[in-house]
Amino acid sequence: MFTDTINKCAANAARIARLSANNPLGFWVSSAMAGAYVGLGIILIFTLGNLLDPSVRPLVMGATFGIALTLVIIAGSELFTGHTMFLTLGVKAGTISHGQMWAILPQTWLGNLVGSVFVALLYSWGGGSLLPVDTSIVHSVALAKTTAPATVLFFKGALCNWLVCLAIWMAIRTEGTAKFLAIWWCLLAFIASGYEHSVANMTLFALSWFGHHSDAYTLAGIGHNLLWVTLGNTLSGVVFMGLGYWYATPKSERPAPAKINQPEAAANN
């Protein structure tokens, strides 16, 4: 039932591990690209949201954020939140080791951070119409996120990456227009529901930091948010999606590591 999708995810995990080991610069550049792509989506939705009545703002922002994951998937790049699912399935299928997984994840996160801050800098240098005004929702949302309780951030992070990984999972299982609809619906649900995505928050926080933010907005608050949201994102990617679909697949249908390790299987992803 899920064997083919697990095969593709595990083969992608092997590809990620090879890229990280054999071409570290390429891996970091690709990770930075993912952070930048998500950042472009954040700039888009906050530009639109700043103009809208609060009653319709979540729907419009959610309906337009699909560009972020579409760029990550279709253009190709290395996104931390998606890696939590891919690498977990790679470990279970035997295409990578636990050590490789936990070495790659922080590198991906840091690469995403570099790209997120870079695109925020470009926006700031380009005039950044959202940044000079202290009433901009960039600043109010960033402050609210950095002062939220840890438990709220953790569980919103878990719910968020459940949807993001579902979007990626469904994109793997579908073709054509259905692929884009899967991404669109899941990201609409994530943004409109107010969930927390560590990489999306990176750009938002950088945007606010480079602008006219409140004195209550601090680096400690940013670190607080990113810590708990990252942990929540990791929980859902590893447990809900990676382990969830592995154990939802009958043992007799789970892929054999020897089969997945064939070079042609990795090349097909």
Swiss-Prot record:
Subcellular location: Cell inner membrane
Keyword terms of this UniProt record: Cell inner membrane, Cell membrane, Membrane, Nitrate assimilation, Transmembrane, Transmembrane helix, Transport
Membrane topology according to the record: Multi-pass membrane protein
GO cellular component, one term: plasma membrane
Membrane-spanning residues: 30-46, 59-75, 108-125, 154-172, 180-195, 231-250
Residues making up the signal peptide according to the UniProt record: none
Cytoplasmic domain ranges by topology: 1-29, 76-107, 173-179, 251-269
GO molecular function: formate transmembrane transporter activity
Gene Ontology annotations of biological process type: formate transport; nitrate assimilation
Extracellular topological segments: 47-58, 126-153, 196-230
A Pfam family this chain is assigned to: Form_Nir_trans
Family statement: Belongs to the FNT transporter (TC 1.A.16) family.
PANTHER family, A to Z: FORMATE TRANSPORTER-RELATED (PTHR30520), NITRITE TRANSPORTER NIRC (PTHR30520:SF8)
Function, in words: Catalyzes nitrite uptake and nitrite export across the cytoplasmic membrane.
Protein name, UniProt field: Nitrite transporter NirC
